[in-house]
Every structure is written in structure tokens, then in C-alpha cells.
Amino acid sequence: MSKNSGKDKAKSATANKTIALNKRARHEYHIEERFEAGLALQGWEVKSIRAGRGNIIDAYAYVKHGEIFLIGAQITPLIQASTHVVANDRRERKLLLHRSEIDKLVGKVERDGYTIVPTAMYWSKNKIKLEVALAKGKQTHDKRDAAKDRDWAIEKQRVMRRGNRDA
């Protein structure tokens, strides 16, 4: 065992923790609550994700027979992946959640008109986790207001920086 193996492991674990982010979800939805879910993956999918070939931008989750599935997430297979398994890069993937979390999500989706969107995919204790959010869709004027607020915050920062230089 090398002298710095513990430090190297800690640095590499924190540096490569996030696999994929869904920035579009923050723009398109009002995010109410977040949940951590496991993913039921095949071996080639884990290998592809390790190589950085996971994408959750167009993904969403839906309820089917009391279970929650992720659809639209793209995991591109590696060229040297196994040939005896047919690799479908956009297949349905089951989300692994506690029953109480599933019941809460199902109730909100069916009664209150919420949707379930993935916001991040990351490593946690050598397992791939998906952060899903309970969200409501934004209307066009909400998106414009958010953009206006963001632009104003940037402009305020510029003015403050200029003011600090003059003083």
C-alpha cells in the first residue's frame, strides 16, 4: 500500500462524483422536493457510465403498476461491449426507492399534476444514484421572469465590482 493511497482515493472520489446533470430541469420546472433513487442497470450500462457516456437531459420518470421507471435517459454502449446482449441505449430503467417515497411520488403525480424529472446522476459508495425531483412545469412568463432576475443579479454584481474598484 502506498503512502498517499488514502488521499488519492478521497480526491478521485470527490472529483468524479457527478456523472451527469440536467440543467434544463431547473429552467423548465419549479422543483418542489428531491429524492435519491437507485437505478436497476445492466453490466454494459455501468461500464458505459464509468466511461462518461450517460445523458439525462431528455429523461423523465413515470409510474407504471406502482413502480417508477426512468425513460429517455441515454447511455451509449461502448464499442467493445458484449455482443450477446442487445444494447438499447434508451430503454426503460427501474428506479429503486423506498415504498413510502414511491407512494408519495405517485400521489403527487396522479392527484396534483406534478411530474418526476431527473436532476443529477452521481456515484455514492460505488453505486450509481439518480436524484429525481418532484416538479411542476413553468409557464413561459415564469421562464422570462427567471431569466430577467438572473440577468439583474449579474448586472448588480458588475456594478458592485466597479464600485469597489473606485473606492
From Swiss-Prot:
The gene is smpB. Pfam families: SmpB. Required for rescue of stalled ribosomes mediated by trans-translation. Binds to transfer-messenger RNA (tmRNA), required for stable association of tmRNA with ribosomes. tmRNA and SmpB together mimic tRNA shape, replacing the anticodon stem-loop with SmpB. tmRNA is encoded by the ssrA gene; the 2 termini fold to resemble tRNA(Ala) and it encodes a 'tag peptide', a short internal open reading frame. During trans-translation Ala-aminoacylated tmRNA acts like a tRNA, entering the A-site of stalled ribosomes, displacing the stalled mRNA. GO terms for molecular function: RNA binding. One of its GO terms (cellular component) is cytosol. NCBIfam families: PRK05422.1 (NF003843), smpB (TIGR00086). InterPro entries: SmpB, SsrA-bd_prot, SsrA-bd_prot_CS. It comes from the Bacteria. HAMAP family: SmpB (MF_00023). One of its GO terms (biological process) is trans-translation. Keywords: Cytoplasm, RNA-binding. It comes from Stenotrophomonas maltophilia (strain K279a). This is SsrA-binding protein.
